[in-house]
Amino acid sequence: MSKQINAIRGMNDLYGDQSHAFDYLVQTAESVLKQYGFQSIRLPIVEKTELFARSIGEVTDIVEKEMYTFEDRNGDSLTLRPEGTAGCVRAVIQNGLAHNQIQKLYYTGPMFRHERPQKGRYRQFNQFGVEVFGIESVDIDAELIALSARLWERLGLQNLELQINSLGSQAARQAYRDILVAYFEEHKSQLDEDSLRRLSTNPLRILDTKNPDMKALVEAAPKLMDHLDEASKQHYEELKAHLDDLGVAYVENPNLVRGLDYYNRTVFEWVTTELGAQGTVCAGGRYDGLVEQIGGKPTPAVGFAMGIERLMALLMDNELVHEENGPDVYMVLAGDSTKRPGLVISEQIRENLPDIKVQMNCGGGSFKSQFKKADKSGARIALVLGEDEVNQKQIAVKYLREEREQEMVPWDQMVTLLKTALTESK
């Protein structure tokens, strides 16, 4: 017997309830986004490595340590995408989608990072990304946050906290960076190994440390908010005013900096305490310089990404996936002569009642075993077809979830009965 081949560590199969929760989440998100005028875009999983080095930043943890990068047969360096925004920006530039027009786009799919797998953090994970191009005013920032809040409401998710901050302009952030480096240089002995490395590469990320021993040091650090340019201050105040008008509660977090270099001004995260250390389920912000940085014309842009696996965990832990995944009708067949008419009847139901899910018993089995399968499937009705029923062109209708008598129905009346029993009662 050959040795069993398993999935790669940190890359998981989704099936059963997980797969259903995945579909439910994506379908709900798509319905909300379409209410706000968004359109879908499909993006490649593999991009040129240069794209991520230019956009995310060469000295970020993602580019330095976490990307799956390889050379193809032509010697080109390619990378499995670690996030979706850079690829979406590349597509917008390449296809001229943002030329003198506003684009509101969303996408979903797998991302890849070589991290240490743990609950809520995987090497292959799925994201739902939302991006807007061509709007500079702060009202679109507020609308995106309101959109995410609307999605949580639609899903029934509670206990999510919105944290917001402003990173200001690139010039203001550079000036603040120098101030921050000087502060941490004075307290270098208190920095952990990771922060010492970031001090020379990406010092703002020190503010995002999860090391409890550095909490007091970080809290006492100079605040970026005190060094913002006037335009960014006004932008931030207007954002808060919009959120107040919309009734979206928020917490100001001066240490919220995000792990990607391309953000400016608005940044935000939705966090929960229900998932342990990996508490961020949605994060985003404004990235007005990224389109130009990747080779396009200057274009304001803002967006966010949701971690699908983390949101799935919240939905399943709180039993919020309500839609039934099993069939409505289970077809029980007795005898070889019932297989062909059973198949025809099943197709007639699907053709006339497309919202009704029909599962036909295949592979034989006794009446008893078939009824066990029907009951286990969650079906509300079992249609029973034996040789006598075939000869009489009738079918027995057995109600599995109601105290009702079994009845015999002519084939030509079956669709009408099912429509009344199932469709009108849904």
From Swiss-Prot:
Main location: cytoplasm
Catalytic activity annotation: tRNA(His) + L-histidine + ATP = L-histidyl-tRNA(His) + AMP + diphosphate + H(+)
Gene Ontology BP terms: histidyl-tRNA aminoacylation
Keyword entries, A-Z: Aminoacyl-tRNA synthetase, ATP-binding, Cytoplasm, Ligase, Nucleotide-binding, Protein biosynthesis
Family: Belongs to the class-II aminoacyl-tRNA synthetase family.
Listed NCBIfam families: hisS (TIGR00442)
Listed name of the protein: Histidine--tRNA ligase
